[in-house]
């Protein structure tokens, strides 16, 4: 067993009527797991806040690895995560508030070694103050997310690249803002900053305006910062 684990909590993306094969991020992650061979996946589904918290606690109870990374993959909108409606507008799951989700993450992170959190949800990354508050009151070193309504396939591929490089950081690298930003630079350099990853109200948003990275190095006296601009500068996307 490797020393690294990826905890994956995935909400429903589509109804069976809309996409009967029920697409999931799991096969993409399993491909990375088989390719790298140095981490293990703990996967759960959730439909509402109680299910989210139970899934997270169960995964942590079963994980024996020293280094943990959390990937939350679900619908996002404004300040809600995991909501899903049927085509006729009826709510299948109401999801949960972002503040509720982050409160749960902070609580478990104080007793589990969660190094980083990837929020694979539309628009949630725009709530930078919430990300910084989460880092301030937890040992989590970084949070990455998206600030607009992202396309599913492209964002999933970006998530895979981000996880590959972020999980490759050494423990001592987490003391350095430069090295953390460097890992995300390497992950995103595979893509074009001009790629129109978001579609909103008759306009498109390029990848360079869609990402959000908050960091708090693991060292005494460190404070959380929004390092999105530094990341864009390193990529040459600013």
Regions found by a protein language model. Name each.
Residues 156-169:
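Short, small-residue alpha-helix embedded
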Residues 75-78, 124-126:
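A short acidic, glycine/proline-enriched capping/turn motif at secondary-structure boundaries
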Residues 88-156:
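Catalytic cores of nucleophile-dependent amide-cleaving enzymes
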Residues 28-36, 56-63, 101-109, 135, ...:
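Hydrophobic, Leu/Ile/Phe/Ala-enriched alpha-helical segments that form helix-helix packing faces
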């Amino acid at each position: 067993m490797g020393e690294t684990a990826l905890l994956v909590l995935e909400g429903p993306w589509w109804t069976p009527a809309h996409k009967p094969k029920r697409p999931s991020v799991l096969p993409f992650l399993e491909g990375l797991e088989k390719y790298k061979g140095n981490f293990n996946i703990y996967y759960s589904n959730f439909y509402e806040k109680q299910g989210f918290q139970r899934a997270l606690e169960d995964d942590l109870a079963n994980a024996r690895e020293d280094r943990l990374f959390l990937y939350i993959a679900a619908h996002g909108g404004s300040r809600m995560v995991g909501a899903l409606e049927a085509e006729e507008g009826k709510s299948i799951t109401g999801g949960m508030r972002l503040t509720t989700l982050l409160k749960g993450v902070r609580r478990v992170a104080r007793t589990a070694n969660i190094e980083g959190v990837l929020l694979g949800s539309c628009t949630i990354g725009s709530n930078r103050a919430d990300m910084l508050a989460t880092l301030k009151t937890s040992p989590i070193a970084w949070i990455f997310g998206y600030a607009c309504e992202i396309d599913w396939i492209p964002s999933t591929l970006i998530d895979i690249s981000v996880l590959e490089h972020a999980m490759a950081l050494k423990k001592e690298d987490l003391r350095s803002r430069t090295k953390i930003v460097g890992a995300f630079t390497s992950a995103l350099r595979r893509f074009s900053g001009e790629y129109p990853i978001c579609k909103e109200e008759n306009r498109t948003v390029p990848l360079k305006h869609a990402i959000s990275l908050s960091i708090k190095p693991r060292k005494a006296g460190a404070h959380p910062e929004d390092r999105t601009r530094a990341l864009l500068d390193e990529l040459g996307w600013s």
